Regions:
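Short, amphipathic alpha-helical interface elements at domain boundaries
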Residues: 1-56
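Short, Lys/Arg-enriched charge-dense amphipathic segments
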Residues: 3, 47-58, 98-111
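Internal, charge-rich low-complexity segments
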Residues: 22-40, 76-100
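Short amphipathic alpha-helical interaction segments
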Residues: 51-83, 92
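Short, amphipathic alpha-helical interaction segments positioned at domain boundaries
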Residues: 82-128
């Protein structure tokens, strides 16, 4: 039997997923006000535990979540029929979401910039 190798971050997140009642994550997206169907993923599998979490830390967590998904240890879904709004409050308060909003605001009205509307897609991580 092949033994899975997990990074320290993957181990930490996997443990947290197993003990959590719900494990909310988000996907930061940029949408276009000019082309309604046009969207771009700014940052995938965003897991924030503190509003001040750095981009570097969030990217490390994102990579760990993707690694756990690819190894078949978790399932990630952004197609939620219902969610608990308070689970996602920290994401709205985060410095990274503020940065996404400022980036989109700067693009508004500039020629050639299509992605001018920040969005957040709610997701959940489920243990397998």
């Amino acid at each position: 039997m092949k033994r899975l190798s997990l990074s320290p971050m993957e181990k930490e997140i996997l443990k947290a997923v197993h003990v959590a009642r719900r494990f909310p994550i988000v996907r930061f997206e940029l949408h276009s006000s000019q082309e309604p169907g046009l969207r771009s993923i700014a940052l995938n599998h965003v897991y924030i535990t503190h509003p001040e979490d750095s981009m570097e830390l969030v990217k490390e967590r994102s990579a760990a979540l993707e690694g756990l998904r690819k190894k078949g240890l978790v399932r990630i879904s952004y197609a939620l029929p219902a969610y608990v709004q308070s689970d996602y409050q920290i994401y709205y308060q985060s410095k990274l979401y503020e940065l996404l909003c400022h980036t989109a605001m700067e693009a508004q009205g500039k020629e050639g910039f299509l992605f001018d509307f920040p969005a957040m897609r709610f997701g959940q991580v489920f243990p397998k």
